[in-house]
Amino acid sequence: MYGLYQSPIRRSLQADIYRKPHGFIYLFGKEYFYLIKEKKVWPFIFREFQVMGLEIPDDRSKVREELKKVKYYFGKKWGNICFQFGIINEITSFDNYRARSQDIIGKVRGMRLQKRATIIKQTGLKLAFKENMPQSTITIKLAKSDEELLAEMNSGCADRVKKAIKKGVKVRLWTERDDAVFFEKRQNTAWGKGFHTITKEQYTMLLKILRKHDRGNVFISELNGEQIAGSICLFRDKTIVYLYGFTDRKYTNLWGHHYLKYGMFEWARDNGFEFCDLMGGAPTGFPEHPLAWVSKFKESLGGMKSEFYGSYDLVLNPVLYYLFKTFTRIRAKLKK
């Protein structure tokens, strides 16, 4: 997942399909793609900058020197609020199966808190108040038999996969006749969970590009011709990356979402992929995190969980940053 952020396919998604304002910046001897998020409050324009997939050197003096240059360049224009860095240096990684049998949650939480304090002290960055890059990801190694893939899951997840098979649920690849239903169910899932999704035009263009250039595909679980869950995936080298999908809540008792992931693992393995990246979740040891429920499901599938530094802000305008941070938190509370 974290290599995906600076990959050509993501640049194409953001620039050509989602048509987001963007730019390029050199940091630590490497070119990085970044997004520009503009908010217009007449007659002013406020901007946030965001680069994800950044790797920083261990020499923190070099980090401070580079950040100073970024602040000088981007801080000159009034209305520029902050530059957010999604940092992918790894804190630790561990086997999800091992995590279920050993009490390591508290240790991993402590490691993250210590790393946060060190980064803030050594670089002058602030912990981002809006998380745009997940702080962890779960990767499934696919060089296993069907039985081994099931055995790696927790007992509840494995049982649900078996029940879905007994109920007659099937997993297959998307076809054009699935287009309208998939999009509608994806929209319903997004609305039900309170987050935004892409437009129909962007969705159609995304699928067209993925299939035309063999950069990804769509997996669907169904019963008697009814779509009950779906996943859009990207292909990157020998890794298949889960992007997003839907689950039809009317059919939760069929466990199609669980079987969909298992079927996706089988297909990817049989088609030469070595890993499946489940595209992020909550940091370990933070049950209050909004992605905790997402992580719980993904962790039940087995694999390795990797913890990364996460997102930090370089403040460009302290007054605007404080006002924007306060406004964002108030708005989040009002939505609850």
Model feature map: region roles:
Residues Y2-R11, F24, W42-P43, N96-E147, ...:
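Active-site/acyl-donor-binding loops of N-acyltransferases
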Residues K76-N96, R269-A282:
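Conserved GNAT acetyl-CoA-binding A-motif
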Residues M52-K62, A143-K144, G245-L254, A282:
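A short, internal acetyl-CoA/4′-phosphopantetheine-binding micro-motif in the GNAT/acyltransferase core
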Residues V63, L67, C157, Y203, ...:
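Aromatic/hydrophobic pocket-lining residues that form the small-molecule binding cavity
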Residues Y26-L54, D59, R64-K68:
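Active-site-flanking structural segment that lines cofactor/substrate pockets
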Residues M1-F44, T92, Q122-T252, W267:
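A conserved beta-strand-loop-helix scaffold within acyl/acetyltransferase catalytic domains
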Residues K69, Y73, M205-K208, R215-N317, ...:
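Aromatic (often tryptophan-rich) hydrophobic motifs at membrane interfaces
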